[in-house]
Amino acid sequence: MRPGGALLALLASLLLLLLLRLLWCPADAPGRARILVEESREATHGTPAALRTLRSPATAVPRATNSTYLNEKSLHLTEKCKNLQYGIESFSNKTKGYSENDYLQIITDIQSCPWKRQAEEYANFRAKLASCCDAVQNFVVSQNNTPVGTNMSYEVESKKEIPIKKNIFHMFPVSQPFVDYPYNQCAVVGNGGILNKSLCGTEIDKSDFVFRCNLPPTTGDVSKDVGSKTNLVTINPSIITLKYGNLKEKKALFLEDIATYGEAFFLLPAFSFRANTGTSFKVYYTLEESKARQKVLFFHPKYLKDLALFWRTKGVTAYRLSTGLMITSVAVELCKNVKLYGFWPFSKTVEDIPVSHHYYDNKLPKHGFHQMPKEYSQILQLHMKGILKLQFSKCEVA
């Protein structure tokens, strides 16, 4: 063969190899990652399906240039976060076979995903809530939605009714009292021990409206972690009975304790159980007699029934919704932006540090973890979809 012909043949071979490489690598890389995920799902028989999805293999990242590498890394993170959302949705309906450590790994993965509010997701979810429940009009009992003569059914003891006579009717506000609705930024503050040393107090207090649950402490050293601002706080009637002696001999202590809440609304489930009614009314009359700055509101039992039905369609089948999920649902309807603090159903942090059940006591949760609360998995989904934001760890302090 002539020397020139050999050189041409060599160049042709090199061009062919280069062409094959260009055709093979870019087009195949994403598909290859998907195949690996599917193969992993089929081959990993000992791992629950949702966790296999969340642990799908990483795509090999080409390092031709810094910009290419960063773009590929960003795309991989996006794909990982989409898989994560799918995994959360799948385990929300099936919790057997998962350990607490599995869930903490999922939380760790969630924290690696950048959070961004998704206006369309928020609007769609809020519209569904409003269609079923309408917190804006029906969240609390008012003179507008409950006229004199109404036979009101209890939320849980639904076969029992209470007639709304004038002496009860005058306890209700004329209309819904949330005059600045919709609020721009709302904080729903749970009581989880994860708030200890979080330094979230300043951030919470900057919110336009702050919801709290069951008269938690907000003064002293804890304020740097939980804030002190309160616009609405729920009261479980049992705390009135157990801590404040049904407002008989400990009425003065109750009035002293509630002074820290300023002009907040006190929200009670007066019409959930018949046993709650008298105690809730006692709180109303105690505040009225003492000319306290706080105002008493009552959960509307029909709103709570409708809300329970709404969440039941999403797999939450508990005997009764937690106060935290009730208030979170209300906040989504009343607020444009919702952030949750102190929601943590685990016995330890992702760093394996024990967490007390409440931020104001040293009691640890019962040993062992049987299943992740269905409610919390729903809240995680709302976080992943950009409908609300969960604060998992310490807050950033300027």
UniProtKB/Swiss-Prot annotation:
An annotated Gene Ontology molecular function: alpha-N-acetylneuraminate alpha-2,8-sialyltransferase activity
Catalytic residues in the record: 370 (proton donor/acceptor)
UniProt keyword annotations, A-Z: Disulfide bond, Glycoprotein, Glycosyltransferase, Golgi apparatus, Lipid metabolism, Membrane, Signal-anchor, Transferase, Transmembrane, Transmembrane helix
One Gene Ontology cellular component: Golgi membrane
Disulfide bridge positions per record: 186-335, 200-395
Membrane topology: Single-pass type II membrane protein
TM region positions: 4-24
Positions with a binding annotation for substrate: 214, 236-238, 322-324
EC number: 2.4.99.-
InterPro entries per the UniProt record, alphabetical: Glyco_trans_29, Glycosyltr_29_Sialyltrsf, GT29-like_sf, Sialyl_trans
Function noted in UniProt: Alpha-2,8-sialyltransferase that prefers O-glycans to N-glycans or glycolipids as acceptor substrates. The minimal acceptor substrate is the NeuAc-alpha-2,3(6)-Gal sequence at the non-reducing end of their carbohydrate groups.
Family: Belongs to the glycosyltransferase 29 family.
Protein name (database record): Alpha-2,8-sialyltransferase 8F
Species of the source: Pan troglodytes (Chimpanzee)
